[in-house]
Amino acid sequence: MKYEKLLPRFLEYVKVNTRSDENSTTTPSTQALVEFAHKMGEDMKALGLKDVHYLESNGYVIGTIPANTDKKVRKIGLLAHLDTADFNAEGVNPQILENYDGESVIKLGDTEFTLDPKDFPSLKNYKGQTLVHTDGTTLLGSDDKSGVAEIMTLAEYLLNINPDFEHGEIRVGFGPDEEIGVGADKFDVADFDVDFAYTVDGGPLGELQYETFSAAGAVIEFQGKNVHPGTAKNTMVNALQLAIDYHNALPEFDRPEKTEGREGFFHLLKLDGTPEEARAQYIIRDHEEGKFNERKALMQEIADKMNAEFGQNRVKPVIKDQYYNMAQIIEKDMSIIDIAKKAMENLDIVPIIEPIRGGTDGSKISFMGLPTPNLFAGGENMHGRFEFVSVQTMEKAVDTLLEIIRLNNEVVK
């Protein structure tokens, strides 16, 4: 194995349950995330990172790999998140499959679930590689503990294995709650103090992403008028029926399961209630600012039309922006994309530069003034039992970070 401790480090991390909690009001959202951040801080100190500190204000643990060059080069930041998605993360039992043949069905532990190339055709890309997958009962946590392990392995390489590798100052940060969309809300750009950064939070080999969705969340409250159904004619207003009518007024094909590429959508996350009152929760996504604003306006227009028909405010939407397409910031200076692209090409990795059908912590951090595109970390089928990662892809992620650092040495501030 190219980096001896990369896989053991990853396996150690994924066994810790750091599932974030969207219902929490604390930062981080769970005590487990606080404890894991402190554990990462101790690991960072053990590797030799300097100025390692945990920020109570935002749950980030930050450390520094000091420069070993007199060149005035740009300071680079590397970021990954410690939490995992909303799927069982207790008792993660990673399975290792060496020299995968690229065509066999992979059994997930003792469960009835499998990784079948017919369902997951990307498996054919991993012929001859070592895969880490789940036992079918949990997620794996490659999102984003692959990124965490890769950054730590990079730090180990620079500080302990090849300390003569020339580099400027590098700042490392691990934070909470990316999966519930609030991880970067309190990020401290001044404390991180770098010229540009990357999140190592992408998927398959070669992903290089600087364009995300713009995102909003919507909560629609429906006020009904409940009476006995036996005498309901011309009197009852069923709040659940209002919710159904509202949803049906949205464009039929603008849903996640019917869109791809640059197409945006409305996504109904949750619907509950009674005939008296109901509540629907949506997310709104689009890459283009104009279309994003049109989607939000449409949700209000539907409510206004329904209320006008009743002559009462029975449909009450609350729409809040969550994050914006970071391309608006990154495109002002594409040098950090160019350097990452060149790094991959130098390593015979084909860069995959496509819009993210989602967001990253970098979306918010970029709008705080720190351009932060996203690099591949290796995971596939993330957020569930079918998640897996290639050890060789993780190694290439470390290689890519090293090559970015090497190329950055050629750019004098």
Swiss-Prot record:
Gene Ontology terms: cellular component = cytosol
Q: Look up the record and name the cofactor or cofactors this protein needs.
A: Zn(2+)
Q: Name one GO biological process term.
A: peptide metabolic process
Annotated SUPFAM superfamilies: Bacterial exopeptidase dimerisation domain, Zn-dependent exopeptidases
What does the UniProt cofactor note say?
Binds 2 Zn(2+) ions per subunit.
Which compartment or compartments is the protein found in?
Cytoplasm
Q: Which InterPro entries match?
A: ArgE/DapE_CS, Bact_exopeptidase_dim_dom, Peptidase_M20, Peptidase_M20_dimer, Peptidase_M20B
Query: Where, by residue number, is the active site?
Result: 83, 178 (proton acceptor)
Keywords assigned:
Aminopeptidase, Cytoplasm, Hydrolase, Metal-binding, Metalloprotease, Protease, Zinc
* Known EC number: 3.4.11.4
Question: What top-level branch of life does the organism fall under?
Answer: Bacteria
Q: Where does this chain mainly localize?
A: cytoplasm
Q: Which residues bind Zn(2+) 1?
A: 81, 143, 201
Regarding temperature, what does the record state about activity?
Optimum temperature is slightly lower than 40 degrees Celsius.
Q: What does this protein's UniProt record list under function? A: Cleaves the N-terminal amino acid of tripeptides.
Q: Do you know which PANTHER family this protein is assigned to?
A: PEPTIDASE T (PTHR42994:SF1)
* HAMAP family listed in its UniProt record: Aminopeptidase_M20
Q: What is this protein identified as?
A: Peptidase T
What is this protein's gene name? pepT
